[in-house]
Design a protein with these regions (language model features):
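C-terminal motif of bacterial Sec signal peptides marking the signal peptidase cleavage site
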Residues: 19-22
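A structural signal for conserved, well-ordered secondary-structure elements
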Residues: 31-183
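Bacterial N-terminal signal peptides that target proteins for export
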Residues: 1-11
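Bacterial signal peptide processing site
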Residues: 24-27
């Protein structure tokens, strides 16, 4: 019985910690207004948020890619094609549970996670999906509204799609202004 008390305390602390972390996520983040000034003067980049970090802990050394690393973005399929990098992007993305897309230090949107075809979790908000099944020789990256796609018609996903409308408009308008939009 003596040995079970410390274990029970540790379990209670762990559960409370996970609950507080889950409750502190920014599901009600405010929409970013569309601003042509951001498009003209801003720089697009993405940073990773580690498992033990919060969004405010993200530092400059956590930059995963910038607009210079994006070759093009297909509006129809939402495929995002990256240029060749020294370290494969999927390896750089693996330690992070969130990816924040910035335009000139303003958050455009937060991608819930980097997921691969092997992932068996369900995500009801934006994800960066790494597809290696359709082309094993070269993986493809997609920005999806959820993962797996069979959850696209749920109320939660539909609400998130509406919530992200202005951000998508800004993101695509910016990429179009840089000649990186593909239809």
């Amino acid at each position: 019985m003596k040995h079970q008390r410390p274990l029970a305390r540790m379990m209670a602390i762990a559960i409370a910690g996970m609950t507080m972390t889950a409750c502190s996520s920014d599901d009600n983040e405010t929409e970013m207004p569309f601003s042509p000034d951001l498009v003209e003067n801003g720089i697009l980049y993405a940073c990773g948020v580690g498992l033990s970090e919060t969004r405010t802990d993200v530092e400059a050394n956590d930059v995963l890619f910038t607009e210079n690393d994006i070759e093009w973005f297909n509006v129809t399929t939402r495929e995002i094609k990256f240029r060749e990098m020294q370290e494969p992007l999927y390896q750089r993305l693996q330690p992070f549970h969130e990816i924040i897309f910035y335009l000139d230090n303003n958050i455009i949107f937060v991608v819930s996670s980097f997921v691969g075809d092997w992932d068996n979790r369900v995500f009801t908000d934006l994800v960066l999906h790494y597809d290696v099944i359709s082309d094993p020789n070269q993986g493809h990256y997609y920005l999806h509204d959820c993962y797996p796609s069979q959850f696209i018609d749920t109320d939660e996903v539909k609400a998130n799609i509406i919530k992200n409308t202005n951000q998508w408009k800004l993101f695509t308008y910016y990429l179009k202004s840089k000649g990186k939009l593909k239809k």
